[in-house]
Amino acid sequence: MASFLLLPSSLRHVSFFHPRACPLLKLRFSSTAHMAEQRTYAEAIKLLDSLQSNRAVVSSISSTPSDMNLNAIPEMLEWTRKAGYQPKDLAARGLKYIHVAGTKGKGSVSVMVENILLQYWRSKSRPEALGRIGLYTSPHLIHVRERIRIDGLPISEALFTRYFYELWDRFSLAEEGPDSETKPGYFRYLTLLAFHTFIQEGVGTAIIECGIGGEYDSTNILPQEAVTACAVTSLGIDHKGMLGETVEEIAWHKGGIMKAGVPAFSSEQIPEAQAVLEERASEKGVEFTVVERSSALEDLKLGLEGDFQKDNASLAITVAALHLKTLGVTEVTTSTELPEQFITGLETVRWPARCQYLIDGTTEWLIDGAHTLESIASTAAWFLEKHTSATAMRAPWSRNLLPPYGIASYMRNRSDPGI
């Protein structure tokens, strides 16, 4: 028997912009001894969960986002300062970044780039210019530590706890008065925690996925000189309360990650979205390229299923190749045959709950998540492809399908602010 699981949209909306939308819970420890006793991973998670939630932010600003959008980056820079960093410090020790935005596929592109680069880092030659590989994504599936990865693995509970409290103490020392906000909100805290962790752990390359949008996203404080490439994945309508009602408005926000002098790339877009991205690139003095599906993928079996993943893989190939070239590691001609490291990276990449096929006893699961109508269509196409293939092979499960789960949840949540 096979089941089809479409994750509810609520699992997909876990990023935000603005901490002033509602009061933060102000937490105090009564004594140093008490603080020491409570400094466990479990307590760190409780403190993190007490911070302003993403959904609260979306709900509070959905009707009047303009002013708070304009305040987003200045506020994030102030929190960065309170964390002990200036923007230029994010480039400490030669740390280089790849910045990824988009509506659909930005997590997939990010993890593909990570796995390609890991093949070079794990090789016998181990190029020092590349350095350890960091990845920051959202949301997480099970554990919040999944959002911050180093060398392909989530950071440990011990490391998360250590760096979480280092930032917590810095924010506490920076409190300016009884009415001031004492801590950044959930997504901002995790973003700063990722930067802090990467710097402290000596990461050389970090792939950073935007939370919501791009122009005013908390990740958009990266120093221009530290970014080797910006990528925009497929665009669609999402987070309307924060990004706008049209794909043109949304494209404007996503294109906000482009940085002067840094090459920017995009998957193929609908004409309206592509035109806006081209305008933004022109405004910022950016060399902008639309990446077509690579012919080198025709005979390649990607680790992530779904035909649309070939578009994501094409973007990942282009971005990874430029990053390697910029660092002087290798020059890759991606228009023909791919290097072994690229092939291995794309074939072995894994990203749970993204077009994932699982066998559990006698039940076979087809699992994906979607938060836009276009994403649901892509998920349905993948499911149909699997079902058609199974039917052709007369697979037993093709005749015993459980009804899809999650469609009703998605439709019910379509009225939620910012979705």
What residue spans do the PLM features occupy?
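Hydrophobic beta-strand scaffold residues
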Residues: I133, A264, E287-T289
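Beta-strand-loop-alpha "switch" segments that mediate conformational coupling across diverse proteins
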Residues: V291-S295
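Nucleotide phosphate-binding/pyrophosphate-handling subdomain across enzymes
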Residues: T205-I208, S218-A231, L235-H239, E249, ...
